């Protein structure tokens, strides 16, 4: 009898928690009863595996489904859409409830869109080529390299404030342009968040090398990634609560360990 009563109490608690999560999101999503999540076109490893977020494979895809579950949405109630990075950070109405594309939370962006609390704090890493393998992994050693980067990302302020290159860095439109500039010997190195740097070094550069990393707690302006939402979105409180619960339970750390485990093997820049 006691066991039956206890099981009933647990079931009631779980039902109450699920109902509360669903109540939080009720009437606040673009499509009632469904959560619309945007990602890039394409979406890249290790954030999304094989450009197929609906599989739940890859760090951001897995986090999206975990957050959705915490908010009371079944996997079949998660709808994926695509949106460009640059358009997403502009003010105005959105065709998604949340968007995950490694959006760094910055005061400037936060004036025109809303962000969730961070779901990942990213170390910044130096991407270069094997020809620069002997470059000292120190700020002083990196200063003399020819640097490039994507103008609209937070990597540029980190580069200028943490490394302060001897020459002005060259600016490009996106990650692909930076990689092509490196292949053409226009630049020697660029800063990316660590998982992206690892992917680019392994997949897009034949002789790519991640020389070192600045831990998130040491680099000025290091990236904290948040889910992006339309400014004033009432869903924000629900999303924040879900991420907080996943953080407290250790689930976020488990997802990070599963999909971003390579990040621990990169030397720290002194």
What name fits each language-model region?
Residues 61-71, 132, 145-146, 153, ...:
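Extended ligand-binding regions for polar small-molecule ligands
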Residues 154-170, 209-210, 241-270:
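Ligand-binding clefts/hinges and TM-proximal coupling segments of bilobed small-molecule sensing domains
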Residues 86-87, 103-112, 158-161, 188-221:
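A ligand-binding cleft/hinge motif common to bilobed small-molecule-binding domains
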Residues 41, 121-128, 194, 202-243, ...:
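Periplasmic-binding protein-like
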